[in-house]
Amino acid sequence: MCGIIGIVSLRESKKLAEMTVSALKRLEYRGYDSVGVASISSNGLEIRKAKGKVEEVVLQKKIEEMEGYVFLGHTRWATHGPPTDYNAHPHTDCNGNIAVVHNGTIKNYKELREELESLGHKFKSETDTEVIPHLIEEFMKRGMDPFQAFKSAIKSLEGSYAVLAVINGERRIFFAKKDNPLIIGLGEGQNFIASDIPAFLPYTKRILVIRDDELGFITPETVYLEDKDGNVINIKERIRSVDWDIETASKEGYPHFMIKEIHESPRAVKETIDSLMSDIDLVEKVIEEIKNAERVIVIGAGTSYHAGLYFSIELNRLGINSLPVIASEYYNVRSKKGDLVFAISQSGETIDVLQGIRMMRNSGAKIISLTNVIESAIARESDYKIYMRAGPEIGVAATKTFTTQLASILFILSVLKKENLKKMEKAPDIVRDTISQVEGLTKKIGEELAKKSNIYYLGRGLSLPLAMEGALKIKEIAYVHAEAYPAGESKHGPISLVEKGFPVVIINDGELTELLQNNLMEMKARGARIYAVSVNKKMKDADVEIELQSEIPVLSIAPVIQLIAYYAAVTKGYDPDKPRNLAKTVTVE
C-alpha cells in the first residue's frame, strides 16, 4: 500500500518541500520501495523521484531544495512494474504539465493504455497509474476544463484508487477515492490531503475523511467535494478533530497493527481478486502448467505452508498429483523434469523457500511463485509470478497476507474448476461480514484461552490447515502451547492428555461435520472444554461455538482464528505486533 501526501499553500517556499519530506518519513511504516515528489512553482511543474529509501532519495535528488506552492509526495509499494526510478510516482502526461500519484489497482489499465497509445500518447513506465495523467491530458485536449477532465478520467477507471492530480499553473489538488483511504487536513493558509493522518498531524488536527466514490479538489483555503452523481457535499458537518499522537495515528485508531491488518483483510482480498481478474491471461497460463505437470510440489514456511497445504489438498482431490513441502525440509524432495513447484512466501525472501526452488529448478522443475513483494528474490527466480495485493504488513504474525494467499489460491482453483468467478467477487464482503459478526465472541474465547497452558486445535480435510494456522497464531503471539492434529489422529496419542477443562478448538468447515462430531464427543467424554468454529453446519454439545454461514468457508475461518489469538495475546498483556524471538522475514537457514 502506497503512502500519499499533498500540500497546497498560499505561499511559495522551500518549507513545503521540508514538510513533504517529513510527511513521507511518517508514512514509511507502510513499507515502500521508491519515492517521488512533484512541485508547482512560478517556474512550472517539477518531478524528482527514484528507487530507494526516503532519506536516500531526498539526498540524491535534493528534494528539500525544491520550491513551490503545491507539492505531491509518494512512497510506492510496487504492484504493476518492478521497483525502478521510472516506475516511481508521480507520473506525468506527454507534455509534463500534469502529475499524478495513486494508491490502488486500475483493473482496465491495459485497455486504457492501448486506446491512449492509439491516440498518440507516449508512456514512460510499466505502471497502471500512468494512464491517469494521459486521460486527463486527452480530455483537456477535447476542450474540458481541468476539473471536468479529471472527473472524466476518474469515470474511465475500473478498480480501486486514491488519486491526487496537479496541473501546472493550478493552485489546487484534485482528488478521488474508491476503496483506498484519503483524508484531508485543514490548515491555516494551507490544506493537506493524504493516505494517512500521520502525514499531516504535526500541522493540523482538523480532518475530513473522504468517502468512497467522492471526488473534488482542495485549494489553500477551501475544499470542494462532490458525490458520484455530481451533487455538491456540505463538508462542515463532516469536519472533526483528532487527539492522536503519531504512533496512534499510524494505526488509524487501532491499538495494534495486527488488529488493524485483520480489519484491512477485506480490502486486501478485493485488491488481490481485482488484480487476478485483470491478469487472467497469467492465471490461465498457470492453470495450463498445473494441468500438464506430472507433480505439483507446493512449498512454503510457517503460515505460507498452511496455505500451501490447503492448495495441495484441493489439487489432489481434483486428481492432480501434489506434494506439500515444509520449506526447511526441501532437501528431502527429489524433484525432476516435469515437476511444477508452487512456492508461497509473504516476503518473497524466505531463505528455505529460495534454496528449495533453486534446488528443484536445477533438477528441471518449473517454478510458480505467490508472493506479496514484487520482484522479490523468489519472484525473480520464478517462471511465473503471481502477486498478492495485501500491501505492507507491519505485524510479525501473518494476518491479511494469509487471507490473501488463500484468496489467490481459491481464485486459481475456481479457474481450474471452470467455476463462475462471481463467487470470488463476493470474497471481500464475506471476510468483512465475518469480522463484524465474530469480534465479540472471539474476544471472549481469546480471554478464556489466555488462561490455559495447553490447547488442541483439531480439523479434518480442508479445515486441517486452518486448525494448524490457528494453533500457530496463538502460539506465536500469546505464548500458549498449542498443537494441531487431524481430528481422527487425536485418539492415537493426543487424547491421553485430555482431562477436565482441557481446551480443544475444533475447526469445522461444514464438509466433514459428522466425523468431527464423533471426535468432539470423544474429547467431551474426557472432560474437555470444546470451542467450535463451524461454517454452514452446527456442531452439537460444544461449550462455545462460533456459527457462520459462508459461500467460501476458508475465508470466514481465517479471520476468526486470527482474532482469537489476538485477544488471547492482549489479555495476557503481550504486544501482538512484536512477538519475542520471531522475525517478519526469515533469511537464514
Curated annotation (Swiss-Prot):
Q: Does the keyword Repeat apply?
A: yes
From the UniProt record, give one GO term of the biological process aspect: fructose 6-phosphate metabolic process
Location of the SIS domain = 286-426, 445-579
* Localization, UniProt: Cytoplasm
Coiled coil stretches, renumbered: none
What does the entry list under GO cellular component? cytoplasm
Q: Which reaction does it catalyse?
A: D-fructose 6-phosphate + L-glutamine = D-glucosamine 6-phosphate + L-glutamate
Where the record annotates domain Glutamine amidotransferase type-2, the positions are 2-221
Highest taxon of the source? Archaea
Where is the chain membrane-spanning? none
Q: Which Gene3D superfamilies does the annotation name?
A: Glucose-6-phosphate isomerase like protein, domain 1, Glutamine Phosphoribosylpyrophosphate, subunit 1, domain 1
| Active-site residues, record numbering mapped to chain | C2, K584
Keywords noted in UniProt: Aminotransferase, Cytoplasm, Glutamine amidotransferase, Repeat, Transferase
Its EC number is 2.6.1.16
**Primary location group:** cytoplasm
The task this protein performs is described as: Catalyzes the first step in hexosamine metabolism, converting fructose-6P into glucosamine-6P using glutamine as a nitrogen source.
Q: Which HAMAP family match?
A: GlmS (MF_00164)
Q: Which NCBIfam families match?
A: glmS (TIGR01135), PRK00331.1 (NF001484)
**Quaternary structure?**
Homodimer.
Record's protein name: Glutamine--fructose-6-phosphate aminotransferase [isomerizing]
- Organism equals Sulfurisphaera tokodaii (strain DSM 16993 / JCM 10545 / NBRC 100140 / 7) (Sulfolobus tokodaii)
The gene that this protein is the product of is glmS
